[in-house]
Amino acid sequence: MKVPAYWKPREPKNALTCDPPVPYDLQSSYQWQSILEHDTCYAAEVFDKMMIELVYHPERTSSVIMRTDIILDSQEDDSILNKQKSVFENLDERYQISRWIDRRIIPRNTNLDATMDQTVVVLHEKLENDRILMYLPHLDKSLEQPYNHLPYYHPAVAGIAFHYKGSSVEVLYLVEKDFQRELSSRLLRTAHMLLLVLHKHCKGAVEGYQKRMLHDTVVERNKFQDTYVILKDKYAKQLVDNWVEKTDPGKHVFEDLAIAAFLIELWKQTYSSNKEFSFVDVGCGNGLLVYLLLMEGYNGYGFDARKRKSWETYPLWVQVKLYEKVLVPYFLHDFETKIPFPQLPAGFTMSAANIHDGRFSENSFLIGNHADELTPYLPILARLNQKCYFMSIPCCVHDLTGAKISWALPKPRNPKHGGRYAMYIEWLMQLSEEVGWNIEVEPLRIPSTRNYALIGRKLLSNDLLHSSLSTDALYDIVEKNHGSQGFFVHAMQVAAANSRSH
């Protein structure tokens, strides 16, 4: 984590303190030790808000944590607070419990790290404006030094506390009373990082920081993550170990596992059964996504202009679902009456075996995962085919001619989003809306900066369900969006070249 120039934490003058109360069952053996403190620039209400946000998002403090599941929250049941007062002796003298949360921390790799249950207690001082938030892991007290048996992502201490004092905030560890040795460098680094993360969040809140993108608006995060972990455990090792492409398996395997997990959860929302539809991966590349979806019981196929080495590593029943075909949308041929086309290669027709004309079976779901020059055609083809939906993850900036875009792209409708990729996403959304789609946008949790998914499963109006897109209307839309001249001939030339090479 980058450390800002203003960040200058210090050791408190009095490291041993009894300010935060110690849970009754730990009082005889443990005490709080203050580790670091830093000046504040925010009010107590900001501390309260940001600390609870971090309680709900522990992954912001450790890359090995995936998420937390909330087991119990007093905000949903006030009676919990009265029941838990007995945990602290003489609490009523100075503090009152304002919130009690039990949570379960879920690591990214459950083969390396265990889950951990933890209680979070928020205390408000009655006479002052002080706040204390304590993290208390559920210790196995039958063990000697039970904190040494906690997962690696938690420091080897019996508890962590943050004490807001108005002008400063400090981080404390719950340690044994006979604790005499110096803290390890790891414990010090962890305290430093925890305090810095808190300070950055609070400072950002004061300065009006708002997230540029909102995740998990289409598919719930927990459902996606649970499915991703299942897929990763089933497939990741064998796929990485047997990778035959020149590309990095550390990126591509886990990216496609995440996309497969997202699609599976999206389809659970969209369809009542996986027998209700079939998928088509347009420009399927190495075929990994097709393999994963077929293995998970979904029906479909993929095609690409060029066969990949990976295809032969899949089971035969998967290989027969991967086709070497070039997409030449049939409606471009219909435009012949409006724009001149050069001669096709001798003896070559639109019905050639290695041509896919963009006609799909009813109830198809089209996938465009970094499909490059095919990307702009997905919303059009999905609209032209019966009961057809799509999800596109755009990458390189191509228009309907198949060329890299050289014309001025529109500004994103969200002013927080900038850059050429954001403008390309905006153009694709506008094109999709022009042919009738009500587009859902989801920044996917994948290891790629080109991670926006455009999802078309709803039309702008119910009236469009009963009307088709005419050739004339489509031609006008295509021409308005800088035309398609060049795509048809280039695609046919690729198809002709492929047929000659076999």
From Swiss-Prot:
Protein's UniProt keywords contain Methyltransferase: yes
Tagged with keyword Transferase: yes
GO molecular function, one term: tRNA (uridine) methyltransferase activity
EC number annotated for this UniProt entry: 2.1.1.211
Catalytic reaction(s) noted: uridine(44) in tRNA(Ser) + S-adenosyl-L-methionine = 2'-O-methyluridine(44) in tRNA(Ser) + S-adenosyl-L-homocysteine + H(+)
Family recorded in the similarity comment: Belongs to the TRM44 family.
GO CC term, one of those recorded: nucleus
Xref: InterPro entries: SAM-dependent_MTases_sf, tRNA_uracil_MeTrfase
Keywords: Cytoplasm, Methyltransferase, S-adenosyl-L-methionine, Transferase, tRNA processing
GO BP, one annotated term: tRNA methylation
Compartment(s) of residence: Cytoplasm
Name by which UniProt lists this protein: tRNA (uracil-O(2)-)-methyltransferase
Species of origin: Schizosaccharomyces pombe (strain 972 / ATCC 24843) (Fission yeast)
Pfam families the record matches: AdoMet_MTase (PF07757)
Domain of life, per lineage: Eukaryota
Function of the molecule: Probable adenosyl-L-methionine (AdoMet)-dependent tRNA (uracil-O(2)-)-methyltransferase.
